[in-house]
Regions:
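Sec-dependent N-terminal signal peptides
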Residues: 1-10
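Scaffold/interface architecture of coatomer-like assemblies
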Residues: 11-292
Length: 292
C-alpha cells in the first residue's frame, strides 16, 4: 500500500508524461490568383505551437459537409448598387462554393430570404425583388443565422456578411453576435464596404440609444478571435473580387494533423512552403472541443 501512495505522490513517469498527442487544425490554401490549391503535401507544411515547431503527420482535403449563411445588406446605404453590384456578386459567390454546399440567405431588414438547401435561381429572383431601403439591422440577421447554423450541426459552418458599415445595433447585440459565434462554432467572413465605416447603436430591432461605434475594428477583432476573414471593399464593384477570394478559401481547405504535447493547446501557426500561396488558419479540433 505504501508504494502505491508514493507512486501517486510523485505523479506519472517522464516517459508517460511525454507521450505525444495528435491534434488537427483546418487550413485554407489558395494562390494569389485565387485558385484553390488541390495537391498540398505534408512536406510543404510547417506547423508551430507557441513558437515550437511540431511534426506534421498528415494533410487531407477537408471534405466534410459545409453550410454557408450569407447576410446581404438591403439598407438604404447600398440602394443605388444593390441590384447592379451586390446581387450579382453574391450569386457568383454561391455558384463558386464547393459542390453540395448548402446555402441560406438573409437580408438586413432583418429577414430570412431562403432556407438552407434552397435553389439558387429562386434565391436570385427573391434577392432582386428586394427594394433596398431603410436601416441596416445586419447584427440581428447574423445572430439569427449563427443560431440556425448551430442547431443544424453541420461540421463546417460559415457566415458571410456583405454590406456597408452603416449597421444599427446595440451593445447587447454586438456582444450577442460574438457570443453566438463562439457557442455555435461558426466561422465569420465579412466584406465591409467603405467609406461608411461607422455604425450606430440605435433604436429598431436591436434597441438602445444612438451612439457611433467602430465597425471596422469590431469585424477585424471578431475575425481574428474566431479564425475567420475580414476585408474592406473601397466600392461596391470590388465586392465580387473579395467574394471570389472567400470562395477560393473555402474550396482550398485541408485538415492538418500534427504531433503536440499533453496540456492546453498553444497558439498554432501554419506556413505553406509553396510560392505565391495564401493561408488562413481555422479552428482546431481542440479549440472546438473547448467551446463545447
Amino acid at each position: 500500500m505504501l508504494w502505491l501512495l508514493l507512486l501517486a505522490a510523485v505523479g506519472p513517469s517522464p516517459a508517460a508524461a511525454s507521450v505525444p498527442l495528435i491534434r488537427s487544425v483546418t487550413v485554407s490554401v489558395y494562390t494569389k490568383k485565387l485558385v484553390p490549391v488541390e495537391d498540398l503535401k505534408a512536406e510543404e507544411v510547417r506547423v508551430s505551437e507557441d513558437k515550437r515547431e511540431r511534426k506534421v503527420l498528415g494533410v487531407e482535403r477537408d471534405r466534410r459537409p459545409l453550410e454557408v449563411a450569407i447576410v446581404v445588406d438591403s439598407g438604404g446605404t447600398v440602394a443605388a448598387a444593390y441590384r447592379s453590384d451586390l446581387v450579382p456578386a453574391v450569386v457568383d459567390f454561391w455558384k463558386a462554393l464547393p459542390p453540395d454546399t448548402k446555402v441560406a440567405l438573409w437580408s438586413t431588414a432583418p429577414a430570412k430570404i431562403t432556407d438552407f438547401g434552397g435553389d439558387l435561381a429562386a434565391a436570385e429572383t427573391k434577392l432582386r425583388m428586394i427594394a433596398a431601403a431603410g436601416g441596416n439591422y445586419g447584427f440581428d440577421s447574423m445572430i439569427d443565422a449563427c443560431r440556425e447554423l448551430g442547431r443544424r450541426g453541420i461540421p463546417r459552418r460559415m457566415i458571410v456578411y456583405v454590406g456597408s458599415g452603416s449597421l444599427q445595433a446595440s451593445r447587447t447585440g454586438t456582444s450577442a453576435l460574438a457570443r453566438a459565434l463562439g457557442e455555435t462554432h461558426v466561422t465569420p467572413m465579412a466584406v465591409l464596404i467603405l467609406p461608411s465605416a461607422r455604425g450606430s447603436f440605435s433604436g429598431g430591432p436591436s434597441g438602445d440609444a444612438v451612439e457611433a461605434f467602430d465597425v471596422q475594428g469590431y469585424f477585424a477583432q471578431v475575425a481574428k478571435a474566431y479564425h475567420g476573414a475580414y476585408v474592406e471593399a473601397l466600392s461596391t464593384l470590388a465586392v465580387a473580387q473579395w467574394l471570389r477570394q472567400f470562395a477560393a478559401d473555402l474550396n482550398g481547405q485541408y485538415q492538418v494533423r500534427y504531433e503536440s504535447e499533453a496540456g492546453p493547446e498553444g497558439v498554432v501557426k501554419v506556413e505553406v512552403r509553396r510560392k505565391d500561396t495564401r493561408v488562413r488558419v481555422g479552428r482546431s479540433v481542440a479549440e472546438i472541443a473547448r467551446l463545447e
